[in-house]
Swiss-Prot record:
Keyword Ribonucleoprotein tagged: yes
Pfam families given in the database record: Ribosomal_L19 (PF01245)
Entries under HAMAP family matching the protein: Ribosomal_bL19 (MF_00402)
Record-given protein name: Large ribosomal subunit protein bL19
């Protein structure tokens, strides 16, 4: 890779991101701009996948809101994400937890890991 591109991407990487894996429950604090105002919106759910490497790395969080499953994908190093908190470490044996889309209620629970 071009050294100039490497230098630019290295400056864009965030260092305040906690380590998390698919199956972990996270709370994402997202900066939302509405007109001239900016506020923080929380999105709390289970990480169902991580994808990519470096600046372009993303993760998808799934939650159930009013009985409807909502998935939202965030860039890992985005300045729009104010804070990322890991609330629980889950124990799963897959990298992509797409099977959770078909499960409801207690069947969609994930065991807690001892980390």
């Amino acid at each position: 890779m071009n050294p100039l591109i490497q230098e630019i991407t290295k400056s864009q990487l965030r260092s305040d991101i906690p380590s998390f894996r698919p199956g972990d429950s996270v709370r994402v604090h997202v900066r939302v701009v509405e007109g001239t105002r900016e506020r923080i919106q929380l999105f709390e759910g289970v990480v169902i996948k991580r994808h990519g490497v470096g600046v372009s790395e993303t993760y998808t969080v799934r939650k159930i809101s009013s009985g409807v499953g909502v998935e939202r994908t965030f860039p890992l190093h985005s300045p729009r994400v104010a804070k990322l908190e890991v609330t629980r470490h889950g124990r799963v044996r897959r990298a992509k937890l797409y099977y959770l889309r078909a499960l409801r209620g207690k069947a969609a629970r994930i065991k807690e890991a001892r980390r």
